[in-house]
């Protein structure tokens, strides 16, 4: 019996992961990437001696990656080195007004207590609840539930936590902490989920456990180490990877996939998995097979996009760390410009990353590599003049 032939669209982390599991289970797997290099948004840029992560830069939830490699009787350390950052990150609230989050709960509790008397006790209780939510979200929902029906989410454990699904992160944080600085630090992790803290259920405080409880890590050569590790594992399992393969459309006969069209050429397959955005994937299907209309997608609130800058400095940059959050402007005003009234932000918050602070080889000697990110709404007018302004 011949192996079923599966095409996977895109080469981001979900695609690279799926490819490995499918190949392990005996399928013939080919990953198709539209760009000239693999990794999706986690590609790497090298130029004039500088190395930049082009997308993801926060290595959180290390246990998830350890489990991934262990599922194939491998160890993460077989593929790349990992270092825990201290401080994990530094938050700027204004000139000479900063808070650094260090690498253990005991140190973080001292930082909180210094900022707000009594907050360390409250924080410990908050993080313990966040840990409980993390255990449920990752070990139960992620690893054990097949994700076929919403009914799976209704069980004795989730019922006991029903209030955390009704309330929101902002409400819970502001009920427990008075310091504006501490509130911002505790609300920021849910930005990784693409939503405002006021619109995110309190259950998602498990991101705070990922932050404070598990810590912030960094692969030696950047996030692309993880991409290379997953590809190396995939190749050992028989996965094929093809770049410069932009899928034009998916061909079906009845309700059965027959293959895909790429640059005017047809390639047959038995199954297709898409790691691309849902809306884009639907646009590849004939209209009669699409579940949602363009009008439907037009009414949806999209997760933020971002304006990115990759900057090579010919000097060392003082007073910054590996990860830096600049919260020196109004958080809510910027969020409104992203979600409520989409427009280019007038006074944006931003994030700055300098991997050369941890691994000097990512920049020439005496130099610094800077990655700068401004969260913005999607589908904004984009011109060189606007980019120059920022």
Question: Which sequence ranges carry the predicted segments?
Answer:
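Short beta-strand to alpha-helix junction loop
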Residues: 158-169, 212-232, 382-388
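FAD-dependent oxidoreductase catalytic-site/capping-region signature
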Residues: 351-352, 356-390
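Rossmann-like flavin
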Residues: 94-200
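Helical element adjacent to the flavin cofactor pocket in flavoenzyme catalytic cores
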Residues: 206-257
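N-terminal glycine-rich phosphate/pyrophosphate-binding loop and immediately adjacent elements
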Residues: 3-135
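Mid-domain catalytic core of redox enzymes
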Residues: 248-364
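Residues forming anionic-ligand binding surfaces in small-molecule and nucleic-acid pockets
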Residues: 200-211, 365-367, 376
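Short glycine/proline-enriched loop/turn "hinge" motifs that connect secondary-structure elements
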Residues: 81-83, 197-198, 360-367
């Amino acid at each position: 019996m011949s192996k079923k032939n599966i095409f996977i669209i895109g080469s981001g982390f979900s695609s690279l992961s799926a490819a490995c599991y499918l190949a392990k289970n005996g399928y013939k797997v080919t990953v198709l990437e539209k760009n000239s290099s693999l990794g999706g948004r986690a590609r790497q840029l090298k130029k004039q001696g500088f190395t930049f992560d082009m997308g993801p830069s926060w290595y959180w939830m290390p246990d998830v990656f350890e489990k991934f490699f262990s599922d194939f009787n491998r160890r993460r350390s077989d593929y790349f080195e990992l270092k825990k950052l201290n401080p994990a990150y530094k938050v700027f609230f204004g000139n000479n007004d900063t808070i650094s989050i260090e690498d253990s709960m005991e140190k973080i509790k001292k930082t909180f207590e210094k900022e707000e008397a009594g907050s360390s006790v409250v924080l410990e209780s908050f993080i313990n609840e966040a840990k409980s939510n993390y255990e449920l979200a990752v070990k139960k929902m992620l690893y054990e539930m097949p994700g076929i029906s919403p009914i799976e989410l209704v069980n004795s454990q989730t019922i006991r936590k029903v209030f955390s699904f009704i309330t929101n992160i902002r409400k819970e944080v502001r009920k427990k902490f008075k310091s504006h600085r501490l509130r911002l630090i505790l609300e920021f992790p849910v930005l990784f989920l693409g939503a405002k803290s006021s619109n995110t259920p309190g259950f998602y405080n498990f991101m705070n456990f990922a932050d404070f409880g598990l810590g912030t890590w960094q692969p030696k050569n950047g996030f692309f180490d993880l991409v290379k590790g997953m590809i190396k594992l995939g190749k050992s399992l028989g996965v094929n990877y093809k770049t410069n393969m932009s899928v034009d459309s998916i061909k079906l006969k009845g309700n059965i996939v027959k293959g895909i069209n790429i640059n005017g050429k047809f390639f047959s397959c038995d199954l297709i998995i898409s790691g691309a955005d849902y809306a884009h994937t639907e646009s590849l299907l004939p209209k009669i097979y699409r579940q949602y209309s363009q009008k439907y997608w037009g009414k949806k609130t999209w997760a933020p996009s971002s304006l990115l800058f990759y900057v090579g400095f010919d000097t060392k940059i003082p007073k910054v760390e590996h990860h830096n959050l600049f919260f020196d402007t109004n958080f809510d005003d910027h969020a409104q410009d992203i979600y409520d009234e989409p427009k280019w932000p007038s006074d944006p918050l931003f994030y700055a990353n300098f991997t050369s602070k941890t691994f000097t080889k990512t920049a020439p000697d005496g130099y610094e590599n800077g990655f700068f990110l401004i969260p913005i709404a999607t589908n904004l007018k984009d011109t060189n003049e606007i980019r120059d302004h920022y």
